[in-house]
Regions:
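C-terminal output helix
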Residues: 105-114
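Short amphipathic alpha-helix used as the core "switch/output" element in two-component signaling
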Residues: 39, 62-73
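The feature encodes the CheY-like receiver
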Residues: 56-58, 85
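Alpha4 helix (beta4-alpha4-beta5 surface) of REC/receiver domains from two-component response regulators
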Residues: 63, 84-101, 112
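Charged docking surfaces used in two-component/phosphorelay signaling
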Residues: 15-23
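Acidic catalytic/metal-coordinating carboxylates
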Residues: 32-36, 60-63
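Active-site beta3 strand of CheY-like receiver
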Residues: 45-51
C-alpha cells in the first residue's frame, strides 16, 4: 500500500482521513498546513501521494504543491476543498493535480480515488 502525506488545518478531518486510510492499509503522515508538508519533505518523508487541503493558514496546500512541483516532485495529488466547484484558487491550471475532493468528504470516493492513483 501507499505512504500518503495528508494536510488539513482541521484536526478532526486529519484524524478521520488518517483512520480511514490506515484501515485501507496505507501509511499516513499528517501536516496542519502547507509549511508542515514542506518541512516533512525536507526531513526526508517521501510520500507516494499527497492529499492537500486547498486553503490552510500559513501556507496553503496549493502553495506547498507549487513549491514541490517546481522542485521536480511528480507524485499524485488530490486537492480537498470546501468549495463545490474547483476554481483557479483551488485547482490552478498551471499545476498538475490528479483529483479534487469536496468537503464534506465522501470517504468511499476518497478511498477509490486513492486506490486508482496509487495502483
Amino acid at each position: 500500500m501507499a505512504m500518503i502525506l495528508v494536510a488539513d488545518d482541521s484536526e478532526t478531518i486529519l484524524l478521520l482521513m488518517r483512520t480511514r486510510l490506515e484501515m485501507a492499509g496505507h501509511t499516513v503522515e499528517t501536516a496542519a498546513d502547507g509549511q508542515e508538508v514542506l518541512d516533512h519533505v525536507a526531513d526526508g518523508v517521501v510520500p507516494d501521494m499527497l492529499l492537500l487541503d486547498a486553503m490552510m493558514p500559513r501556507k496553503s496546500g496549493i502553495d506547498a504543491l507549487r513549491e514541490l512541483r517546481n522542485a521536480g516532485w511528480e507524485v499524485p495529488v488530490l486537492i480537498v476543498s470546501a468549495h463545490q466547484n474547483p476554481g483557479d484558487a483551488d485547482a490552478p491550471t498551471d499545476l498538475e493535480i490528479d483529483g479534487y475532493i469536496t468537503k464534506p468528504i465522501d470517504f468511499d470516493r476518497l478511498l477509490e480515488t486513492v486506490a486508482e492513483l496509487t495502483a
